[in-house]
Amino acid sequence: MSSSSTALKTFSLTNSILEISPQDAIYKFDPDEARRIDQESPWSKDPHFFKSCKISAVALIKMVIHARSGVPHEIMGLMQGKVVGNSIVIMDSFALPVQGTETRVNAANEANEYMVEYTEGSSKAQRPEHAIGWYHSHPGYGCWLSGIDVNTQMNNQKYQDPFVAVVIDPNRTISAGKVDIGAFRTYPENYKPPSTSSSEYQSIPLSKIEDFGVHANQYYQIDVEIFKSTLDNELLGLLWNKYWVNTLSQSPLISNRAYAVSQLSDLHQKLSKVQTSVTTTRAAIPVLQDKEGSASKKEKEEKKKEENQLAKGVKDSTKIAVEAQHGLIAQVIKDVIFSMRPKGDASTAQLSDVTDTAMSIG
């Protein structure tokens, strides 16, 4: 039990889960306030009205478990919650019986019937929160919205706003040890978003880059915050006790082996593509600035573009190496803690050296 508790605390710290009082207003549902907000619909006047998406820890774990169970296929579910200020608050989530592939997920009539029955049952069980978002997984290729996702979210916002789209990458979650999650809202049709600086770099597989870039200006990302109350700890403990043994007994190096291979293959393709466009490293012949100014400027721009692509390749390779080192560190630590060893300081000192070396590299 103590090991399970430690693992749960580590999960909470890694994902920056905030603990709030169970008497906090976030846990209270006011139907009059909900109707007032729906009537005013401030989000219809300001496309950037929502600034954050707050997700309960229970809903988060349910979504992550669901996403992981579907690998390598995508999964889909709905989220229930409410609007508080400029935030969409997710109180609970439930899976949908849908058929997914490695690149998309399709909701059939059975899923729609299940959705209606579940929401009606929630009302009878004194859970009045409405469906306020949907979630699905991107196994191994990051958190963003594809063209199909953008169309789905646009329809949701058009007919049942407020609505939010959440994407989870279960492969990167296992590999990095932190939930890889993103929350998104789409812009209205014919809306031109203001030019913004590029967000934090995200590694996208070469096969998905075109789809990622084409629709990048049709939606925006909002901050994700995770919260829980002291009353949630017991429920989280029950959920965690069921899965923490698998966490200890499995290694991300083995369970995520296919994902690691796909990452290396993708990195090879990216570097090969960059290599074909890299100019010669031989020093350029000096030319007069007034005659060759425009040509020199063009060469600098091309060189900057090449360096940018190479820098992305370096970031991808560093990410792969760090995640592999973290997996090795975890295996060494579990070996030190749980393996039976003869008395003596030699083996312990040797393992300590291995751990220190791995940590210094990672």
Kindly label every feature range from the protein language model.
Residues 1-133, 139-362:
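MPN/JAMM (Mov34/JAB) isopeptidase/deubiquitinase module and associated MPN-bearing subunits/adaptors
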